[in-house]
């Protein structure tokens, strides 16, 4: 164990434990913060020469602990794969993130971001820098509110998409995708940041308008 791994592991545990102790969750907080510190320290992902690196570590260890804990679960799942997710140190080291070229994802051909970790990138650097990194920082800045808002929008959007399909019978999946995914403010933000809006994927009748270059995938 090198010095950085030890320092980030101990610091992460202290920070995670301290922030959740008032909620009676000091031990889980310390475990998540400490494990993230150990994994991230051993992979040297945080850029200590820039304020963003310190902010990333502090947020991952405190306000963003839910996303960080979920990311630890992703790391564990990646280790069960034969290729271990094809970890990309060249895209991770001192860049405040963990990047995998393959691995777990909720949709085929789509990258997936969980906390400070991106999987199934497939070498798409522009997608990483201009879309997935938006999600990494959304998880950090919105903290425990992020999964709540994202999940609530997804659920309500699925209901709205289903209702639209019942009314017009013009493609259930595309309607649900449009309302639950593409209209999700967090996804809309990332697509606009990437310059890929309007996407060609949403149901045209309900798609938001805007300037863009095409679709993400």
Predicted segments with their positions:
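Charge-biased, low-complexity intrinsically disordered regions
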Residues: 1, 9-22
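Metalloprotease/metallohydrolase-associated module, dominated by Zn2+-dependent proteases
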Residues: 4-13, 51-83, 94-96, 100-108, ...
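Transmembrane helix interruption/hinge and helix-loop junction motifs
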Residues: 17-27, 142-143
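Membrane-embedded multi-pass helical conduit in multi-pass membrane proteins
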Residues: 26-53
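Active-site scaffold of zinc-dependent metalloenzymes
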Residues: 96-126
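Short alpha-helical catalytic segment bearing the HExxH-like zincin motif
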Residues: 124-136
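Catalytic Zn2+-binding segment of zinc metalloproteases
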Residues: 133-152
């Amino acid at each position: 164990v090198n010095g950085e791994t030890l320092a980030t592991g101990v610091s992460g545990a202290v920070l995670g434990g301290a922030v959740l102790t008032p909620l009676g969750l000091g031990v889980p907080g310390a475990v998540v913060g400490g494990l993230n510190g150990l994994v991230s320290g051993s992979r040297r992902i945080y850029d200590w020469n820039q304020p963003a690196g310190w902010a990333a570590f502090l947020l991952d260890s405190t306000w963003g602990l839910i996303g960080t804990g979920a990311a630890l679960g992703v790391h564990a799942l990646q280790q069960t794969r034969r290729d271990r997710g094809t970890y990309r140190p060249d895209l991770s080291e001192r860049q405040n993130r963990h990047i995998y070229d393959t691995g777990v994802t909720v949709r085929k051909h789509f990258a997936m971001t969980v906390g400070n970790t991106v999987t199934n990138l497939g070498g798409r650097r522009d997608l990483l820098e201009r879309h997935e990194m938006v999600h990494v920082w959304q998880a950090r800045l919105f903290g425990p509110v992020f999964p709540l808002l994202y999940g609530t929008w997804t659920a309500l959007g699925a209901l709205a998409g289903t209702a639209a399909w019942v009314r017009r019978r013009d493609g259930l999946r595309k309607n649900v995708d449009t309302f639950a995914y593409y209209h999700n403010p967090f996804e809309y933000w990332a697509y606009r940041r990437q310059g890929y809006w309007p996407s060609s994927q949403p149901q045209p009748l309900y798609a938001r308008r805007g300037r863009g270059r095409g679709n993400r995938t």
